[in-house]
From Swiss-Prot:
Domain of life: Eukaryota
GO cellular component: extracellular region
Organism this protein belongs to: Platymeris rhadamanthus (Red spot assassin bug)
Similarity annotation: Belongs to the cystatin family.
Keyword set includes Disulfide bond: yes
InterPro entries: Cystatin_dom, Cystatin_sf
Subcellular location: Secreted
The protein, known as: Cystatin Pr17a
GO molecular function: cysteine-type endopeptidase inhibitor activity
Tissues of expression: Expressed by the venom gland (posterior main gland) (at protein level).
Amino acid sequence: MSCLKIITLFLFLAAVIASSIANQKGKHRVGAPEQINPNDANLKISLAKAISSQNAGVVVVKITKATRQVVAGFKYVVEFVAKVAGTNKQKVCRTVYIEQAWLKKTSVKNFSCK
């Protein structure tokens, strides 16, 4: 085997091993859901759009958990505490929606409060 082939094989194996180690350490993978900061201003805006489209009659008190995934747009899964409008009663809610900014469209796939 020529020296060039041996070096190429070595570099290829080193790249495969490095990639494997990075994936094992929890690095973000393309297309996988990623945790996002519940205080993110863009998250709050997009969640408000999703809630208003449902006529849910709730006001967000606190976002407790949120993920975002690149699909045909951004898929959000958001868990939050909400207050029923006009009362002090609070509920725990969860919604899944897809935001397609270039179409100016937000599609709610699931919305529930308990």
